[in-house]
């Protein structure tokens, strides 16, 4: 099956910027990605990394300065109404008319499509009836997010772009949105979302592109990204017994050693095999008896922080 979205070597400049003597600023540096039907493809990165700009170029909302974008086989910039009808978009700020109420708005949006989605089902599923009589301007951020998601699905799209879909949601609404996204993926939709929340990316994604400062610095499935080279270890904490007169060694800043009770110590922050080797060597020299090792799997947040830190050092 062909990818629904293919981006190759995407470049984007903004400007001219008065603070930079009228120069242009490059914000996307050769981004390449693809998104498949029946998958959630996530652009993960900090605020300002270039995720939303990439999404805007992918939708054809802004022109690129280089590279190519193919959305359902077409160039999305200046796309035909036929292509637009196959794509749903949820913007980070909602983009909703403030004076309208949610349900009339959703029915109005659905009226533009030949194959509208199940608006009543979306209203029920996303709990929009709870605030149906309130104008958009008076809704909370999370309520606006739910309306924006329903609007993105109003045309029964094949591809859905979701920019920070869980922003402002309470835990219950967040779970409802996550469940809906998973069902849409299982139904064969291509879902492309952005997030700066590592937990969201880890829970939802089939494939992740990590974006940092306009560069695609890593990509893969969550399992691939969290898999480790042999130099890494998933130790989270170590507790051990020793003499109360133990002289503590100098440790790297990321390691935190404390005496919880006399003769009983806890070390937090062990990250690498080198950390663990230094620790075991010290135990051997001091005849220290380890008591317990607490292990945890690597998370996407660990991977993101390490990759971003390496990128910053490289720059």
Language-model regions: role of each:
Residues 44-46:
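The feature captures the beta-strand-to-loop junction immediately N-terminal to the Walker
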Residues 59:
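Helix-to-loop junction immediately C-terminal to a conserved catalytic motif
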Residues 67-78, 83:
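Conserved ABC transporter NBD signature motif
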Residues 107, 111, 116-131:
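Conserved ABC ATPase "signature" region
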Residues 160-164:
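Catalytic Walker B motif of ABC-type/P-loop ATPase nucleotide-binding domains
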Residues 178-270:
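ABC transporter nucleotide-binding domain
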């Amino acid at each position: 099956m062909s990818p629904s979205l293919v981006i190759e070597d995407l470049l984007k400049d903004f400007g001219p910027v008065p603070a930079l003597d009228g120069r242009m600023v490059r914000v996307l540096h050769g981004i390449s990605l693809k998104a498949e039907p029946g998958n959630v493809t996530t652009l993960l990165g900090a605020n300002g990394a270039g995720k939303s700009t990439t999404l805007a170029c992918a939708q054809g909302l802004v022109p690129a300065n280089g590279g190519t974008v193919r959305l359902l086989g077409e160039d999305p910039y200046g796309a035909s109404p036929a292509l637009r009808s196959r794509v749903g978009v949820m913007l980070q700020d909602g983009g909703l008319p403030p004076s309208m109420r949610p349900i009339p708005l959703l029915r109005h949006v659905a009226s533009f499509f030949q194959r509208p989605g199940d608006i009543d089902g979306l209203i029920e599923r996303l709990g929009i009836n709870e605030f149906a009589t309130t104008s958009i301007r008076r809704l909370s951020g999370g309520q606006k997010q739910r309306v924006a998601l329903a609007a993105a699905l109003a045309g029964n799209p094949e591809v859905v772009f979701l920019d920070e879909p869980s922003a402002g949601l309470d835990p219950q609404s967040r779970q409802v949105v996550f469940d809906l996204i998973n069902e849409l993926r299982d139904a064969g939709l291509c879902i492309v979302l952005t997030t700066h929340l590592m937990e969201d990316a880890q829970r939802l994604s089939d494939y992740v592109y990590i974006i940092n400062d306009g560069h695609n610095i890593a990509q893969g499935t969550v399992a691939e990204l969290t898999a480790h080279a042999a130099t890494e270890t998933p130790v989270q904490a170590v507790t051990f017994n020793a003499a109360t007169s133990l002289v503590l060694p100098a440790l790297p800043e990321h390691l935190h050693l404390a005496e919880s009770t006399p003769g009983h110590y806890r070390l937090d922050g062990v990250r690498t095999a080198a950390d663990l080797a230094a620790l075991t060597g010290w135990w051997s020299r001091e005849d220290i008896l380890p008591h317990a090792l607490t292990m945890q799997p690597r998370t996407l947040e660990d991977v993101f922080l390490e990759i971003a830190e390496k990128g910053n050092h490289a720059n």
